[in-house]
Amino acid sequence: MLCLLLTLGVALVCGVPAMDIPQTKQDLELPKLAGTWHSMAMATNNISLMATLKAPLRVHITSLLPTPEDNLEIVLHRWENNSCVEKKVLGEKTENPKKFKINYTVANEATLLDTDYDNFLFLCLQDTTTPIQSMMCQYLARVLVEDDEIMQGFIRAFRPLPRHLWYLLDLKQMEEPCRF
């Protein structure tokens, strides 16, 4: 009996496919993402992407604007030349309704991990063109109110992602010039 359980356990472990980004299970309702968002926390598997204010993915997503073509315009702010600069990035729809192709510095894909539309959105930007894929995920909120339960959900959402070492930047504990 013990041998059977061990064999079954090994078969289950070996049969697990390569891990992809876990995503929200419900169908995405893109129009419900429209509006203002606030960066609450960031996580990355590559600290150089957000270690300093000028780091390439130290960005604050401030709004999402769905287009009639089911694309997604991402409005973000970042620190450049000693001031906060607004950038607009177009996310082009793909076969997967939760993934968008983007062209932004060191990221070529935006993925929506999870959302309830009214309170939070977990979104990741990543570079899928390099052998070691760099990724930055954000916990976005509709209002600037701390919610420990959602923060724990964010941590659970990015933990199973590829790469074992993650760096978490909790924005409620620091001053950020481009966080509105």
UniProtKB/Swiss-Prot annotation:
Homodimer. Glycans are attached at N46, N81. Transmembrane segments: none annotated. The keyword Calcium does not apply. The gene is PAEP. It is found in: Secreted. This is Glycodelin. Disulfide bonds join C84-C178, C124-C137. GO terms for cellular component: extracellular region. This protein is, the main protein synthesized and secreted in the endometrium from mid-luteal phase of the menstrual cycle and during the first semester of pregnancy. Glycodelin-A is expressed in amniotic fluid, endometrium/decidua and maternal serum (at protein level). Glycodelin-F is expressed in follicular fluid, luteinized granulosa cells and the oviduct (at protein level). Glycodelin-S is expressed in seminal plasma and seminal vesicles (at protein level). Belongs to the calycin superfamily. Lipocalin family. GO terms for biological process: apoptotic process; negative regulation of sperm capacitation; positive regulation of granulocyte macrophage colony-stimulating factor production; regulation of binding of sperm to zona pellucida. Keywords: Disulfide bond, Glycoprotein, Secreted, Signal. The keyword Aminoacyl-tRNA synthetase does not apply. Glycoprotein that regulates critical steps during fertilization and also has immunomonomodulatory effects. Four glycoforms, namely glycodelin-S, -A, -F and -C have been identified in reproductive tissues that differ in glycosylation and biological activity. Glycodelin-A has contraceptive and immunosuppressive activities. Glycodelin-C stimulates binding of spermatozoa to the zona pellucida. Glycodelin-F inhibits spermatozoa-zona pellucida binding and significantly suppresses progesterone-induced acrosome reaction of spermatozoa. Residues 1-18 form the signal peptide. Four distinct glycoforms A, C, F and S arise from different N-linked oligosaccharide chains at amino acid residues Asn-46 and Asn-81. Glycodelin-A and -F are taken up by the cumulus cells in which partial deglycosylation takes place to produce glycodelin-C. It holds the Pfam family Lipocalin. GO terms for molecular function: small molecule binding.
